[in-house]
Amino acid sequence: MLLWILLLETSLCFAAGNVTGDVCKEKICSCNEIEGDLHVDCEKKGFTSLQRFTAPTSQFYHLFLHGNSLTRLFPNEFANFYNAVSLHMENNGLHEIVPGAFLGLQLVKRLHINNNKIKSFRKQTFLGLDDLEYLQADFNLLRDIDPGAFQDLNKLEVLILNDNLISTLPANVFQYVPITHLDLRGNRLKTLPYEEVLEQIPGIAEILLEDNPWDCTCDLLSLKEWLENIPKNALIGRVVCEAPTRLQGKDLNETTEQDLCPLKNRVDSSLPAPPAQEETFAPGPLPTPFKTNGQEDHATPGSAPNGGTKIPGNWQIKIRPTAAIATGSARNKPLANSLPCPGGCSCDHIPGSGLKMNCNNRNVSSLADLKPKLSNVQELFLRDNKIHSIRKSHFVDYKNLILLDLGNNNIATVENNTFKNLLDLRWLYMDSNYLDTLSREKFAGLQNLEYLNVEYNAIQLILPGTFNAMPKLRILILNNNLLRSLPVDVFAGVSLSKLSLHNNYFMYLPVAGVLDQLTSIIQIDLHGNPWEYSCTIVPFKQWAERLGSEVLMSDLKCETPVNFFRKDFMLLSNDEICPQLYARISPTLTSHSKNSTGLAETGTHSNSYLDTSRVSISVLVPGLLLVFVTSAFTVVGMLVFILRNGKRSKRRDANSSASEINSLQTVCDSSYWRNGPYNADGAHRVYDCGSHSLSD
């Protein structure tokens, strides 16, 4: 019978996945009740799998697993955590969720998988989350969402997908999902259809659509009409046009149907027939741009009808050579002398300069395909094509370029020294691509570059010295990437005036060696980062306070810890952010100055983090310990010195006595004394050598 019991226990342990035990009972994790709810905190425990662990089975709990190494979730990963009511998995490097991973979590109402590396949501990704009401998946690498990804979430109300790489939402993605709050900020959406998408969320109460490259054309009419018919305060933030250029920076709600779709309903049978060929029109502005061959040139996202490129938001730069737009009949005339131009592109003369070559949206897959090569091109537009890589051989014939637009392609590879021949280039657009690393070698030769736009990429790493190759760089656009840190001296030797770092992954930014190098900054945008309010952010806060609101664009909201969530850190005092550093100091220790005492008691000194009159305990204690140890060694040294001197003194006395005895012995042994004892009369001393021992 005992053998059967042992075999049964062994088989049960094997079936349970070799569970080691309760994470609370074995104190693997911290388990505490907060306001009546059990919090199982397994933060930064190095977990790579959960199948060997279990949690309390007698009560419900909130499970915190952020900061581990759960990079992949396999089916039944949470089978032993069936009493969880919320699950936090931020910052795990999670990149794959196998369908069935959440089976057993039928009680979970809130799921946080933000700040990971998830690239797609497949069908049945969330299978098992029957009661899920809140899903947070911001700051990932989401590009693809299957139409059936959310079909199992029949109670989902809040969906947070901001700061990903989503360019489109599939049809019926929200079918049978009762969404009331939808956050799509900081993605790559150019349009949002009403049919089979927006029409499926009739109960929407809040929607956020900021920081997307909206293409304000006919396709956006349905979104505009839908926004006008939802509850008045449902739209949070702005929907700002990024293209076409004539509407760039304009709010969607300020546009008209005619603005978005100028050709709509323009054809009318009552209008007179077009004039004969010999008839002419008076010069005047046309509703839409035309190519040199007279065909309509439809505006594309991020591009201007005249080949221009968007400058996001308030980031204005000086007038570029493309600012002048030809009007009237002159715009429609072919180029003089039948100027050769690569197939599919349009070429224009720049007054008093070279050529402007517009190859936007021409299905170009390689710059090597652009033939014939024109050596006098000064502005080259290659936006909205299918270019995957660029090499230094591609620009050998374009040494006169001053503007290059490679935005909205599929560029993931930039060969070192690609731009080395472009010594006169001043504007470079490489936004909306797939770059992941920036290095000095990639930008070698751009000694006159003033404007660099690499927003909406997947940049995770900027190597030291990257921008040193561009000493004249003034405007740097790095927003909507995957940056978590910046190297020391990244801005050394560069006099930036405008810098955009919003919608990245920064938790804090160091002042020394990074921000303190921005001595010429007049505008910086840092919003949309998951700032962590801890002692490390205090110098950054003080730096931001010195800049002021006229330089620092938008508020900076805290992401962690929970008690500071979504708070503006400018409204918090330094001792709130770092209480251990700003511990109250006794007035007796600060009585040297009435003013400094007051500051120590209130903790409101504006720059107290750098104030030498207030010493951190972490500095004070080691200092006192050092003084104590030094004093102890000094006392011991003095004692040793005194003792050694005493011994030496005794030796000297002994040696002196011995010397005297030896001298006396010598005298007694002399022939003078041997002749007989010395006797003196009266008061004279009598010394008889024979009657005394010399050892006495």
UniProtKB/Swiss-Prot annotation:
Coiled-coil features, chain-numbered ranges: none
GO terms for cellular component = extracellular region; GABA-ergic synapse; glutamatergic synapse; postsynaptic density membrane; synapse
Q: Where are the LRR repeats?
A: 59-80, 83-104, 106-128, 131-152, 155-176, 178-199, 376-397, 400-421, 424-445, 448-469, 472-493, 495-516
Q: Does the keyword Transmembrane apply?
A: yes
Q: Name one GO biological process term.
A: positive regulation of synapse assembly
Q: Post-translation: what modifications?
A: Undergoes proteolytic cleavage that results in shedding of the ectodomain and cleavage of the C-terminal cytoplasmic tail. Glycosylated. Phosphorylation at Ser-695 is necessary for proper function in promoting neurite outgrowth.
User: Where is the secretion signal located?
Assistant: 1-17
Q: Where in the cell is it found?
A: Membrane; Secreted; Synapse
Give the PROSITE patterns listed for this entry: LRR
Q: Which residues carry this modification: Phosphoserine?
A: S695
Q: Its biological function?
A: It is involved in synaptogenesis and promotes excitatory synapse differentiation. Enhances neuronal dendrite outgrowth.
Quaternary structure (record): Can form homodimers; homodimerization requires repeat LRR 2. Interacts with YWHAB, YWHAE, YWHAG, YWHAH, SFN, YWHAQ and YWHAZ.
Q: What is the official name of this protein in its record?
A: SLIT and NTRK-like protein 1
Source organism per entry reads: Pongo abelii (Sumatran orangutan)
